[in-house]
Amino acid sequence: MGKPTLYLEKACELREAIRRGDYADGAFLSEAQVMRKFGIGRQTAVRILNELVKDGLIVRRRGSGTFLSRLGRHATGRIGLIVHGSDYCELFAPVAKQISQSCQRSGYSLLFGDVSSLCTAERIRKVLRLVEQFLSDGVDGVIFQPIELVPDASETNCKIARRFTAAGVPLVLLDSDIAMPPERSPHDLVSVDHMAVGRRLANHLRQAGASRVVYLTQKDRAPCVLERQTGVALGCKGLPLPGKAVFAEPDDLAAIRRMLKRDRPDAIACYNDRQAALLLQTLAKLGKRVPQDVKVAGFDDVQCARLTMPPLTTMRQPCEEIGATVVKLLIERIRNPTLSVRSILLDSRLVVRESTVPACKLKCML
């Protein structure tokens, strides 16, 4: 990559000076002062100031001068990220990487907070500590993946959102809303279109010959999991068993045996690939052939989906696009807090493998 254009380089210097508090009294440099400071012409000085206006750090008032905006007076150049899944879901590694890169390209540093923990009580304590730490350190905005798999997760997530809102810190939600559908929280959201994803997977199962479809899930999951469940049910509408939700652990031999006997499914959609991989092992122990006896599908397309026997049919999440979009949305919110609430729902691609279509037929499809 070549050397940055001069005006961008000098704008970056002034941006950092603002965030250090060098202009804390509120007044900022005029065009003439920028020209003298850097020994540049008026056109370049105007471009520098326009960059800072675009960042939301300064305002220019005709006849009055140039001043720091409210954001400029309090800017830290830091964005906080709170995720719950890095130690048990590889899906968020590329998302977090893209978030970090996008922050860096936009002139922000990233404060990373991973609240994953096997202990439910510790997970809640950890995320609440992170909230206070971010507020103490000073952040311009926060990207928050709502916590799940804990009792009263919705209440905890709403408490976290209210804390940031009360402190005047913009918040963008990652992957899931904090409100249960069909309700919508007052916060920006970036995720895949979970309902459409569930519906598309269900349509594939129908086309593969399934007529009795089960959606295997757990309690205390994020609202997005319920959206997937709803999508599967909509896609299975009219079938003898139209996407019935079953709450069970995929490696619970007795529970899966009861489900097979009671519901007689010929297809099982799991809320993610790891759960589907565990289910494949359980079905093998119960003597069920996949996909001949039962078709199995997951969501996310993490590495294990390609390594299972048979490989898993799944829905691939656009991780890099998610990461880049959530940073873009947050920076826009930081610069303009009065924007209307936005939901960016991204597309997800169906990846067909041998857990739903026999190898001989799959070759004909490719």
Predicted features, each with a name:
Residues 147-197, 274, 300-312:
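Flexible loop/hinge segments that line or gate small-molecule binding clefts
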Residues 80-82, 138-149, 170-172, 214-217, ...:
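Periplasmic-binding protein-like
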Residues 1-40, 46-50, 119-120, 129-136, ...:
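Extreme N-terminal segment that seeds HTH/winged-HTH DNA-binding domains in transcriptional regulators
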Residues 27-28, 55-63, 67-69:
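Beta-hairpin "wing" of winged helix-turn-helix
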Residues 17, 186-187, 257-366:
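Flexible loop/turn connectors
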Residues 177-180, 184-215, 251-257, 276, ...:
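Hydrophobic alpha-helical segments within soluble ligand-binding/sensing domains
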Residues 8, 12-13, 20, 72-144, ...:
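Amphipathic helical "hinge" segments at domain boundaries
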Residues 199-239, 342-356:
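An alpha-beta-alpha
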